[in-house]
């Protein structure tokens, strides 16, 4: 038995019952995720926007030849400076059965990571850990893929550490208000996005990149 089948057969990853009392596991989500990524691919190709599979989705291709067996979403990365173009492309070209959420289009999008969520409208799935900043956009509980925008960050370790420390001081009260008090602090989110933009512009040519200014990794 190959690795993928062994993992799947020994870990059903039950998603619970639907409204018709039928049990589902994560494998039932994968065909919809494939539909979503193919739609994103179509839109990006039409508008000449580069993208790449990232994080768990890239790992799944390498280790399993497809999805990680327990993965219930897909991860995609784009360049930070392509965000405005992707917003316009999704507004103009995304198919009617899909929807997208992002801060640049809807200030109710309170999520810090990812930058975008693209959803399949004719679906419903509720993220279990709602306290980790649930998407507050209307009708946002469909099956989705995540898109992160990669941005440059400082190479110098001291500057890097200072940025992380500063960012976390801004992030912690935002998360506390949104996740636990259920208050959406619009002003705090704007300041975080302004910081993101400032860092991205200052370190545009840096070989160090991050999906936000608070979770860095080396490219």
Model-derived segments and their meaning:
Residues 164-169:
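Short, His- and charge-rich active-site/binding loops that engage polyanionic ligands
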Residues 157-163:
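A short secondary-structure junction signal
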Residues 41-74, 78, 83-84:
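Active-site nucleotide-donor binding segment shared across nucleotidyl transfer reactions
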Residues 2-20:
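Juxtamembrane luminal stem/stalk of type II transmembrane Golgi/ER carbohydrate-processing enzymes
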Residues 11-13, 21-47, 90-155, 173-219:
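Conserved catalytic core of two-metal-ion nucleotidyltransferases
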Residues 2-8, 27-29, 53:
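Short acidic/polar alpha-helix capping motifs at helix-coil junctions
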